[in-house]
């Protein structure tokens, strides 16, 4: 758009000059073209040298042409400008030169002879007339290019010629010259592209192609339809609209096109619209001959402008200039240039000499189309090429545009070499042109109005938006050709296309309303696109173009979506409808893409989908959804794209990804479903390079995009839902896919338990199904739930289904369990059998899915009653412990018990019949059955997990349930861990509620069983058998089976009586520091309390932690502190706690006495433990003392008694036996009795150590006495925790006392 800005300025400066010198310049250029191209002046019979001077001094140039002189002054000499353009360093300085223009026209071959090339191009335009078969740029490109080229060449060729005459052009350029110089510099690059485009045969071929394409395109009458449409565009369109159409090419080409009189087209309204732009205004001819455009396209395009007559032929007597100008252009012949006097409708009035203007426009139109087309055809250039064809098509006959694009072979042939070169330059310069390209493409897609809008969008970048022109929509052919360009454009901007596509599509649909809505982008007046292209875009655009061209989409324009702005995206969207024109344009694009990386068109649909997804994703997830919807709208607008897109989808089965393949097929349906959507999406899909980019973008959200793709693939069935929920509900989408007929796949996937990422990564609905079956629990059901899964993504629903499957498994399991039940008659047999049963159940459960349901009705029915019965029993037993709430679990059992209460009762009776053994053997089988029935019971458990079943019920059948759940997990493809975790969860709940010691133990056992079940079947079976026995006993509390409880008589009796809550103890071992910290916390807590009983309880609890610390010290010999010292300090703490409450007082409460008992027990065992720790020392002391006594035994015997003498030397109690022989031997008066100090200390230490035993027994006896007063409490404690003895370990002591303290807290309401 910089070119437009530059030309606006330049045109504004040169408006009067154009009006005055236009004729001369046109004539000069025309002569130059004729000389350079060595073609007869077919189109330009007047043979005016419009660009002779500016581009290159030609023999036939009218030296006296004021316009040429002014162009030269503005643009400079061709050689000079050629050098400037050729020199990239200079190009960087040439801010005024739009890089887009340069890449559009300049080709590598034209770089040296930029303006001569232009002349040559002028000749090829003649050749185009003479050799219409010569390959040329896509018709739409040629049309827009011709129009733009006329404008560009008028400005650019003149400017180029002026640049050719650097002194003159540069001198006259003045303020516009810096930009113009940049334009010149970029024009040299553009000249390369022009060289690429400039094929004498190529240019004429464009005309023919345009002529033939119109018929090939939607408009069977390319000349008249394109001409009429173009006339309508320019005549009916407001100047801005016409300007838009011209400017949609995104370069001075627009001006040139406007200048070029299209014989069949009146450019009256259009040029003013174009001229409303800075350079287009009144200087339209000059604006179209803008130095920018001229330079960009001058070398190659200027000569190529001659195809204007061909264009007229192809469009009907419309020259690109005429079509683009939208003015009443003179006949397509150059003589009509006077007529062509570019309608000075708005800002810029074309030169006063309409004939010159017309000739110039024709020349420009004739020569420019190919260069512009080629230039824009590449990557972004492709877009601009499409854009130009779109505009030209709109201005010209849509048929012509379609012809252009529809005659890809000719264009490819003529352009192939030059177009490739120009394409490269284009790629370099097309980054900015891409913005214009979208306009061009939009123009092609849309009517002149849309073209104008697209141009306006492009304009904002380069020039102020001109008043919208009311351009009648070109025939579908125009749109189709534009679609080609726009598809590439939309590809480039596919990211934002999602949003803009719908808008653009709507614009296309409502082109008239959109006509006046060009989005004025900040004109990059100083930042010429050519500059941008030469420096920055050269590599980038080549890369993008390579990537984009790789996509062998008919759309040449595969600009990177990032580069394309929203406007471009909108244009692309409009072009999306024009995508059908792509095939014709494709040859030229193919050449460009061959350089890049041609990709099969089949990938294009995928690319579109991907791009579209990516664009949607880039915008937002919501935009993603909206974007898809919008693309749908676009597709609706362009059924052609929809048609084309499905084809690529078909072809795309081979391309990039499975997703692509999947997308190809379902997107077809989706596109079909949403015919409005295919165009934009088609464009994105054609842009496979962009699709990969989007995939890259999707890489982060890769799952979602794929999900989107899958959604798109499957969106034919659930499009909107998929779009909205695809990201969040990938699982849901897979279900939809599942219902779509992937039920078997979903099963497999579910069985495989594929991860969501894997599902996403893998293409196909199978992955989606896997995703939908994210929970492995449902995996076994996919067949039945596949269809249900899509609607029922709720885990509950799936769980319900899964529960049914579990029931099926259980039905089989019961049979196996029954088989195992027989062998497990004895308790031990049961234990042994139960593992077998579990194994069998697991094995059976795995195959069960097939036969589950068969067995389910029978075995499950029976087993369910059993479970219910057991549940009832368990519930009853659970009801016994206050902490456990059997009612909730009982209620679920009641639900099933209501159905199977009779069976449960019957089984209970059966259990009663064989009281000891049979119940146990049957219980394990029942458990096995329950395990088998756990499917049904598992349903209940699942329900419980869902909130239906209470923890008590799981507690009852936790062991069974674990096995069952495990079996289910195996059958379902779920890992045992899940089953175990579920069981553990239930167990934890049960434990939390379990108050009874036996119940808690059972729960713990069950938990262990669950884990063991997941890991070891044998161990689990044993535990499960015991647990089942205990559980059965608990459940059958009404008639306990002593045989069952024989194994655990203590637990059975106590468990039935104990109703207090049981603490859950952690078996993990910690270091001494851990326990020390815990003890300190409790001690500090006690210190903070004021209530003595609570303080005493906390001190006692802290003493237990200290005891654990001492025990840890015993385990770790490296502990610095001796465990004996720790125990000794603990004893002191306990003694202090006991002093807080006088349990001996008659006012002492039961709680005080209970606490005293616990403290005495603890003290007793601590003393005994302390003795044990010092036992070795005590033994050593004892031996030493004994030896000492032996040595002095005889003497001691002779002495009456150490203290019988005068009372002197009365031995201390420790040394009573150590009376010195002297005292014994000698008279009592003979001297004091001496005892060795060593013996004295040994005796004292020995007494201290042995005294611990005495104290221990003493405290124990005290505890026994106090216990008599609270037999029930301590009886329950003994029952729950096991009786505490003097030989109990410190761990048992701590747990026993801590449990008692817990109950004391509960009784004292301290908790």
UniProtKB/Swiss-Prot annotation:
Residues 94-187, 204-229, 377-417, 457-530, 574-726, 818-867, 881-943 are annotated as: Disordered. The modification Phosphothreonine is found at residue 517. Brain (most abundant in hippocampus and amygdala), placenta and lung. Residues 669-679 have a biased composition (Basic residues). Residues 465-477, 883-892, 913-922 have a biased composition (Pro residues). Residues 478-491 have a biased composition (Low complexity). GO terms for cellular component: nuclear speck. One of its GO terms (molecular function) is G-quadruplex RNA binding. InterPro entries: AF4/FMR2 (IPR007797), AF4/FMR2_CHD (IPR043640), AF4_int (IPR043639). One of its GO terms (biological process) is regulation of RNA splicing. It is found in: Nucleus speckle. The modification Phosphoserine is found at residue 430. Residues 101-111, 165-187, 377-396, 403-417, 615-625 have a biased composition (Polar residues). Transmembrane segments: none annotated. It comes from the Eukaryota. Keywords: Intellectual disability, mRNA processing, mRNA splicing, Nucleus, Phosphoprotein, RNA-binding. Residues 155-164, 582-597, 655-668, 857-867 have a biased composition (Basic and acidic residues). Belongs to the AF4 family. It is linked to Intellectual developmental disorder, X-linked 109: A form of mild to moderate intellectual disability associated with learning difficulties, communication deficits, attention problems, hyperactivity, and autistic behavior. It is associated with a fragile site on chromosome Xq28. Intellectual disability is characterized by significantly below average general intellectual functioning associated with impairments in adaptive behavior and manifested during the developmental period. RNA-binding protein. Might be involved in alternative splicing regulation through an interaction with G-quartet RNA structure. PANTHER family: AF4/FMR2 FAMILY MEMBER, AF4_FMR2 FAMILY MEMBER 2. This is AF4/FMR2 family member 2. The lineage of its organism: Eukaryota, Metazoa, Chordata, Craniata, Vertebrata. The gene is AFF2.
């Amino acid at each position: 758009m910089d070119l437009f800005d530059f030309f606006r300025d330049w045109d504004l400066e040169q408006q009067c000059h154009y009006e005055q010198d236009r004729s001369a310049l046109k004539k000069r250029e025309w002569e130059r073209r004729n000389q350079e191209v060595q073609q007869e002046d077919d189109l330009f019979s007047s043979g005016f040298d419009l660009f002779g001077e500016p581009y290159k001094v030609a023999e036939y140039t009218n030296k006296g042409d004021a316009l040429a002189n002014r162009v030269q002054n503005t643009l400079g000499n061709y050689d000079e400008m050629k050098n400037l353009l050729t020199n990239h360093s200079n190009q960087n300085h040439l801010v005024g030169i739009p890089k887009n223009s340069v890449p559009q026209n300049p080709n590598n071959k034209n770089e040296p002879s930029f303006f001569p090339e232009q002349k040559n191009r002028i000749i090829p335009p003649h050749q185009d007339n003479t050799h219409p078969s010569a390959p040329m740029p896509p018709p739409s490109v040629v049309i827009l290019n011709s129009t733009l080229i006329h404008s560009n060449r008028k400005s650019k060729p003149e400017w180029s010629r002026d640049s050719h005459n650097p002194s003159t052009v540069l001198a006259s350029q003045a303020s516009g010259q810096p930009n113009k110089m940049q334009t010149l510099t970029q024009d040299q690059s553009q000249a390369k592209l022009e060289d690429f485009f400039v094929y004498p045969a190529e240019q004429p071929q464009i005309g023919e192609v345009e002529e033939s394409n119109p018929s090939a395109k939607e408009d069977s009458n390319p000349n008249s339809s394109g001409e009429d449409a173009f006339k309508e565009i320019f005549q009916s369109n407001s100047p801005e609209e016409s300007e838009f159409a011209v400017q949609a090419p995104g370069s001075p080409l627009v001006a040139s096109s406007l200048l070029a009189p299209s014989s069949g087209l009146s450019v009256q309204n259009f040029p003013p619209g174009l001229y409303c732009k800075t350079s287009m205004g009144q200087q339209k001819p000059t604006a179209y001959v803008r130095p920018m455009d001229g330079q960009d396209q001058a070398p190659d395009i200027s000569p190529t402008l001659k195809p204007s007559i061909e264009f007229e032929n192809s469009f009907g007597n419309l020259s690109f200039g005429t079509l683009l100008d939208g003015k009443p252009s003179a006949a397509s012949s150059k003589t009509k240039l006077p007529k062509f006097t570019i309608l000075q409708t708005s800002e810029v009035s074309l030169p006063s000499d309409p004939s010159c203007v017309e000739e110039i426009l024709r020349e420009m139109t004739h020569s420019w189309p190919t260069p512009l087309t080629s230039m824009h055809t590449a990557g972004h250039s492709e877009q601009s090429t499409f854009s130009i064809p779109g505009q030209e098509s709109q201005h010209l006959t849509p048929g012509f545009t379609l012809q252009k694009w529809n005659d890809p072979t000719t264009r490819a042939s003529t352009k192939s070499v030059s177009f490739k070169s120009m394409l490269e330059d284009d790629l370099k310069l097309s980054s900015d042109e891409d913005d214009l390209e979208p306009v061009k493409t939009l123009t092609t897609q849309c009517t002149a109005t849309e073209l104008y809008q697209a141009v306006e969008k492009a304009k904002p970048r380069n020039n102020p938006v001109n008043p919208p022109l009311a351009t009648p929509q070109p025939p579908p052919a125009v749109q189709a050709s534009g679609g080609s360009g726009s598809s590439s454009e939309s590809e480039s901007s596919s990211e934002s296309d999602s949003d803009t596509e719908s808008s653009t599509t709507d614009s296309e649909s409502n082109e008239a309303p959109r006509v006046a809505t060009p989005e004025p982008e900040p004109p990059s007046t100083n930042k010429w696109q050519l500059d941008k292209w030469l420096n920055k875009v050269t590599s980038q655009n080549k890369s993008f173009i390579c990537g984009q061209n790789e996509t062998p989409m008919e759309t040449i324009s595969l600009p990177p979506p990032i580069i394309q702005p929203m406007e471009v995206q909108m244009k692309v969207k409009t072009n999306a409808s024009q995508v059908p024109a792509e095939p014709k344009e494709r040859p030229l694009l193919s050449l460009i893409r061959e350089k890049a990386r041609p990709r099969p068109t089949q990938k294009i649909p995928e690319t579109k989908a991907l791009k579209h997804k990516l664009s949607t994703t880039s915008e937002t997830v919501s935009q993603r959804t909206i974007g898809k919807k919008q693309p749908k709208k676009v597709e609706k607008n362009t059924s052609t794209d929809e048609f084309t897109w499905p084809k690529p989808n078909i072809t795309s089965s081979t391309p990039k990804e499975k997703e692509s393949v999947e997308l190809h097929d379902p997107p077809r349906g989706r596109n079909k479903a949403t015919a409005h959507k295919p165009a934009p999406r088609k464009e994105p899909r054609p842009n496979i390079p962009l699709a990969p980019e989007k995939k890259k973008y999707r890489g982060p959200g890769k799952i979602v995009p794929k999900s989107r793709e899958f959604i798109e693939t499957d969106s034919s069935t659930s499009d909107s839902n998929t779009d909205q929920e695809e990201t969040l509900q990938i699982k849901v989408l897979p279900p939809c896919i599942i219902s779509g007929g992937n039920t078997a796949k979903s099963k497999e996937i579910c069985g495989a338990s594929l991860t969501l990422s894997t599902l996403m990564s893998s293409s196909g609905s199978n992955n989606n199904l896997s995703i939908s079956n994210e929970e492995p629990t449902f995996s076994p059901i996919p067949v039945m739930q596949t269809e249900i899964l899509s609607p029922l993504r709720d885990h509950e629903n799936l769980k319900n289904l899964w529960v049914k499957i579990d029931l099926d498994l259980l039905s089989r399991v019961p049979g196996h369990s029954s088989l195992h039940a027989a062998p497990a008659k004895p308790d031990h047999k049961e234990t042994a059998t139960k593992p077998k049963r579990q194994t069998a159940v697991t094995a059976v459960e795995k195959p069960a899915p097939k036969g589950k349901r068969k067995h389910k009705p029978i075995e499950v029915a029976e087993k369910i009653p059993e479970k219910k019965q057991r549940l009832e029993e368990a519930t009853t037993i659970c009801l016994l412990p206050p902490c456990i709430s059997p009612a909730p679990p009982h209620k679920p059992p009641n639900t099933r018990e209501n159905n199977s209460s009779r069976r449960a009762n019957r089984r209970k009776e059966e259990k009663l019949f064989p009281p000891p053994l049979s119940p146990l053997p049957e219980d394990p089988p029942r458990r096995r059955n329950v395990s088998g029935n756990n499917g049904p019971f598992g349903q209940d458990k699942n329900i419980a997990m869902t909130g239906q079943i209470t923890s008590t019920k799981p507690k009852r059948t936790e062991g069974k349930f674990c096995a069952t759940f495990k079996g289910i997990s195996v059958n379902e493809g779920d890992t045992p861990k899940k089953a175990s975790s579920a069981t553990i969860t239930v167990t934890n709940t049960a434990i939390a509620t379990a108050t009874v010691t036996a119940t808690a133990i059972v729960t713990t056992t069950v938990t262990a069983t669950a884990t063991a079940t997941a890991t070891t079947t044998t161990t689990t079976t044993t535990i499960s058998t015991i647990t089942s026995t205990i559980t059965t006993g608990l459940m059958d509390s009404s008639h306990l089976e002593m045989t069952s409880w024989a194994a655990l008589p203590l637990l059975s009796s106590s468990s039935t009586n104990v109703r207090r809550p049981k603490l859950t103890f952690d078996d993990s071992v910690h270091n001494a520091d851990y326990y020390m910290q815990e003890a300190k916390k409790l001690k500090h807590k006690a210190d903070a309390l004021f209530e003595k009983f609570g303080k005493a309880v906390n001190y006692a609890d802290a003493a237990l932690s200290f005891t654990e610390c001492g025990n840890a010290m015993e385990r770790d010999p490296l502990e610095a502190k001796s465990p004996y010292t720790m125990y000794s300090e603990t004893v002191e703490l306990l003694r202090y706690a006991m002093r807080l409450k006088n349990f001996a007082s008659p006012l002492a409460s039961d709680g005080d006495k209970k606490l005293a008992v616990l403290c005495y027990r603890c003290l007793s065992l601590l003393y005994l433990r302390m003795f044990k720790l010092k036992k070795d020392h005590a033994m050593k002391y004892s031996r030493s003392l004994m030896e000492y006594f032996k040595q002095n035994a005889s003497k001691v015997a002779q002495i009456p008694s150490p203290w019988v003498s005068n009372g002197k030397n009365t031995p201390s109690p420790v040394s009573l036996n150590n009376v010195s022989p002297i005292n014994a031997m000698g008279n009592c008066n003979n001297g004091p009795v001496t005892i060795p100090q060593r013996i004295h200390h040994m005796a004292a230490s020995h007494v201290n150590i042995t005294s611990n035993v005495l104290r221990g027994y003493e405290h124990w006896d005290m505890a026994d006495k106090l216990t008599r007063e609270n037999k029930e409490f301590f009886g329950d404690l003994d029952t729950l925790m096991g009786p505490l003895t003097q030989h109990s370990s410190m761990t048992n002591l701590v747990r026993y006392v801590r449990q008692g303290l817990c109950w004391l807290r509960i009784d004292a309401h301290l908790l």
